[in-house]
């Protein structure tokens, strides 16, 4: 693949892309893992929204896999609390099948498995925007 150099930097290209997204889409959802890349993208999107589209609603999705570094969880919680009044937050804590490399006997691990609460790595987050099985009424 041949490289093509442009007369703009990464930030300028990002602003162009955000302009296109905000103009063309009614619903904008940012997936936020708590890593540096998604954290930067989330802040760029929210800054752009404040400056150019203050009335536009942004959704922020975080899939919580239960077992992660404590500092990552703390960063996620701080960030979501900070932005909760300017975005719709979806902090998802559901037992979804996740491939595991830690077991020779099981291919999948189910974070937040409600049938194995005694094995949870940490407590379920307690925020109004957390989505978990307690919200599902069958």
Language-model features: where?
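ATP-dependent adenylation/nucleotidyltransferase module used to activate substrates
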Residues: 1-136
